[in-house]
Amino acid sequence: MDSDEGYNYEFDEDEECSEEDSGAEEEEDEDDDEPDDDTLDLGEVELVEPGLGVGGERDGLLCGETGGGGGSALGPGGGGGGGGGGGGGGPGHEQEEDYRYEVLTAEQILQHMVECIREVNEVIQNPATITRILLSHFNWDKEKLMERYFDGNLEKLFAECHVINPSKKSRTRQMNTRSSAQDMPCQICYLNYPNSYFTGLECGHKFCMQCWSEYLTTKIMEEGMGQTISCPAHGCDILVDDNTVMRLITDSKVKLKYQHLITNSFVECNRLLKWCPAPDCHHVVKVQYPDAKPVRCKCGRQFCFNCGENWHDPVKCKWLKKWIKKCDDDSETSNWIAANTKECPKCHVTIEKDGGCNHMVCRNQNCKAEFCWVCLGPWEPHGSAWYNCNRYNEDDAKAARDAQERSRAALQRYLFYCNRYMNHMQSLRFEHKLYAQVKQKMEEMQQHNMSWIEVQFLKKAVDVLCQCRATLMYTYVFAFYLKKNNQSIIFENNQADLENATEVLSGYLERDISQDSLQDIKQKVQDKYRYCESRRRVLLQHVHEGYEKDLWEYIED
């Protein structure tokens, strides 16, 4: 079966990867035509594919760790790594300068994997695809694999990893005695084919190549499985190796998806690597040590290396995660709930009033409480007063109303911060579109005897505006969980000052430019964006100082 030309990584340059000859060979010779055991075949297709592949230029390959802490350069216990640039711009630029990282392509990650497998194989000397499965089982931790490999119980190790001990390979081959010309039924489709059209794993289960191809394609494309595809035979848990997958699949898109699944498991197990979260971007950021710091991908996306969200200074990852979950749960229905429902005074389930009678019965099967809609007190004392309530000041009703008011106050507080958070998010989206308008304004200015350098202040102003919007957006998340104290008052004053200056700068940039106002606008814009930069820096420095001195107290949601 012919294969596409492309990447083929070999451990020994003198060895070549041979292809399977499905012609009139005897069954016992069939396995000898598979790729050499010292070759990891994961790349016989282009690594760039629209929607699946990677974009951007190539980096020089860095031999770094597959983990952190103090250890070797392989596995999650790995030590230091290759250096790199710190990126720039965007919120938290002052932190970016000291945080070194590299942006790698998917091809380079694949090469990292091959290098990791090669290093392990220099010791254990197994087929490359078997070593890859063993490493995957131990989350690419080389030390753990080595410890288990040499503890004297290899059979148990291979059984746990769902592979057959390579030393038994020759004995398995000798069990095959059927002639290659003899027809036999496939146990999946039950069609008869010559024996030469069948293939299988070391477990001895063989199926026709068409069924193998469809089975692997379904597992990869529909179920998203890569490193855990098992033999299709019922009850067999032996895993399919990489060479078998690449040999039996002809569709380059399926091969590419398989590559991505394998490399994704490598990245996910490595705390020094993280995929860029931008849509359709398949770059990986590699750092020297994991931390909540901003990193910038080649595609332009800046994100927090710790949590993978957009860079969110000044709020910490923990609180941003809680906020996002709260917004997902509450934002769409909170306004309607506040206007149209009340809580049962007994079980606190939310209840909607759908009739004129004030006599309410909770539908919760474990509650069934009867209460008054007006005062939220027990219904029994109301007697026959079906359509009015004269028990407003009774203690039980007052306690229920107090609990209701606290709940409503908490909701109103959430809506206050959520609305401002969303407003700045929407403004940030609009102001990203300002770059096109600013480009046109810069061209107009150059037509009025201003040089290219003289009009760069407009682009700088939009950069600062977007930075301030992003910072302000996340200050409302920080403020939502912040307890009131003297430091929080200073923070709110800094926030208000930055917010006012940002709105003024936004107004300047959206104003029409005429020849008479060019110099006047330039001076105003430059003064204002410099002031915004200064106030943003003051706000962030104050928050970071509070983190260092443990000045902030939080409201547990």
Curated annotation (Swiss-Prot):
RING-type ZnF: 186-236, 344-375
Binding of Zn(2+) 2, residues: C203, H205, C231, C236
Residues annotated to bind Zn(2+) 1: C186, C189, C208, C211
Alphabetized InterPro entries for the sequence: Ariadne, ARIH1-like_UBL, E3_UB_ligase_RBR, IBR_dom, TRIAD_supradom, Znf_C3HC4_RING-type, Znf_RING, Znf_RING/FYVE/PHD
Effect of W386A: Does not affect E3 ubiquitin-protein ligase activity. Strongly decreased ability to initiate ubiquitination of cullin-RING complexes
Chain sites annotated for binding Zn(2+) 4: C304, C307, H312, C317
Primary site of residence: cytoplasm
Cellular compartments per GO CC: Cajal body; cytoplasm; cytosol; Lewy body; nuclear body; nucleoplasm; nucleus; ubiquitin ligase complex
Biased composition (Gly residues): 65-92
Cellular compartments annotated: Cytoplasm; Nucleus; Nucleus, Cajal body
UniProt region (UBA-like), positions on chain: 105-153
Activity: how regulated: Autoinhibited by the ariadne domain, which masks the second RING-type zinc finger that contains the active site and inhibits the E3 activity. Inhibition is relieved upon binding to neddylated cullin-RING ubiquitin ligase complexes, which activate the E3 ligase activity of ARIH1.
Record-listed N6-acetyllysine modification sites: K142
Annotated zinc fingers (IBR-type), start-end: 256-317
Annotated Zn(2+) 3 binding sites: C276, C281, C297, C299
Molecular functions (GO terms): ubiquitin conjugating enzyme binding; ubiquitin protein ligase activity; ubiquitin protein ligase binding; ubiquitin-like protein transferase activity; ubiquitin-protein transferase activity; zinc ion binding
Protein function: E3 ubiquitin-protein ligase, which catalyzes ubiquitination of target proteins together with ubiquitin-conjugating enzyme E2 UBE2L3. Acts as an atypical E3 ubiquitin-protein ligase by working together with cullin-RING ubiquitin ligase (CRL) complexes and initiating ubiquitination of CRL substrates: associates with CRL complexes and specifically mediates addition of the first ubiquitin on CRLs targets. The initial ubiquitin is then elongated by CDC34/UBE2R1 and UBE2R2. E3 ubiquitin-protein ligase activity is activated upon binding to neddylated cullin-RING ubiquitin ligase complexes.
Entries under PANTHER family matching the protein: RBR FAMILY RING FINGER AND IBR DOMAIN-CONTAINING
Official protein name in the record: E3 ubiquitin-protein ligase ARIH1
Organism: Homo sapiens
Gene it is expressed from: ARIH1
